[in-house]
Amino acid sequence: MLKLENISFKVGVDGSDLEIIDNISLEISDGSFTVITGPNGGGKSTLARLIMGIEKPTEGRILFNGEDITSLSVTERAKKGIGYAFQQPPRFKGLTVRRLLSLAAGSELPEDECCGYLTSVGLCSKDYLNREMDTSLSGGEAKRIEIATLMARKLNLAIFDEPEAGIDLWSFSMLVESFKAMCSGSHESAIV
């Protein structure tokens, strides 16, 4: 379970503090699918970065499975089973999609399992398994592959920051169903 207690986040701008997030509390149960909505610049991505540990709150606590993780690093949170998909996925020249999925899973994945992850995000696995994760991929393709890597990790908490970026509406509807299936009947939670 993820619990945010009175989380605030401020940044210094021209000698004064700009409040990005003000006193947010929320609880996300194991196995839940949670969507956070709001206007552009409303703090959604900042909240995701706070949960992942990329940013630290100026006030409040973040608890994960009863443990205070507020001061833990990104790496320490990842070891606890928290994963994050960026708005702009990274590219890895020389690394194939299949190898990336295996790295995410922590061991060499059989081809059929890799294909299953790619299919669940709307990609034809035969077209992508041996492709490199480089700039030849469109933004939407890279985003889907990054989502598939989080699915392969079998996380306790997966955070998807603007997963719709670069993805058409029909495909995103299918991704939402994949997110729900990921959480259904498991302890894995997803925040979109």
Residue ranges and their predicted role:
Residues 52:
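Helix-to-loop junction immediately C-terminal to a conserved catalytic motif
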